[in-house]
């Protein structure tokens, strides 16, 4: 199920919240229809603004719309003219007072929706789909909060006669783990061969108890020792397989003589050195 379902809906109420927050008794269907119309209006009129998310809150006589965008200057416009136009269109649509909040996205490379929009824009500009996917993966993996990413393109890739799907993945993307923080984005690229769908999954770590899990860093000494001894190698054993120096009677005898010889010149507290003496005639 985790491979097919939308990650946001799969984790709704567990690690993710609702993007539309309001209560309605008899006007539920009308409010849902208005929310869909608001999101469609913002997505069709502001393609170049890089809108990552739209959150809607309602009260009795007011609608609050939060727009998370990577390019707030395009949404605001010169002297706020574009923001005033958007607010007027929303008030005409909802017939209520609209409070418009424009929020800037700090890391666009770690937002799945913006990554999907970037790949789709490159596909529309006749860039090879494999190159666009790899470039998006490389730029996303440079972000410190990204632990894994998967990018998938579906359609007539490269102008082929038969449509297919291809994806690239780097790092971990646990889609079935409910505590995993998975960001999901979807966008369509309009090309001369038809539409190509782009899906992006970004894994940003686990959420335990409402807080992001902090990965423990290994000590420097242990990491250094691990680098010095390559993996898969064992210390060489003397003698035949299954035998050591003291594994036989002769070996035990030799080992006992060597240990006795080493203990002659050493005491518990000091080391005694024996100098050669010359006999006098």
UniProtKB/Swiss-Prot annotation:
Ranges of compositional bias, category Low complexity: 238-252
GO molecular function, one term: rRNA binding
The UniProt record lists the keyword RNA-binding: yes
Highest taxon of source: Bacteria
A Pfam family reported for this protein in Swiss-Prot or TrEMBL: KH_2
Protein name (database record): Small ribosomal subunit protein uS3
GO-annotated biological processes: translation
UniProt keyword annotations, A-Z: Ribonucleoprotein, Ribosomal protein, RNA-binding, rRNA-binding
Region: Disordered, residue numbers: 218-281
The protein's assembly and partners: Part of the 30S ribosomal subunit. Forms a tight complex with proteins S10 and S14.
GO cellular component: cytosolic small ribosomal subunit
Residue ranges of every copy of the KH type-2 domain listed in the record: 38-106
Role summary: Binds the lower part of the 30S subunit head. Binds mRNA in the 70S ribosome, positioning it for translation.
Family to which the UniProt record says this protein belongs: Belongs to the universal ribosomal protein uS3 family.
Organism this protein belongs to: Mycobacterium leprae (strain TN)
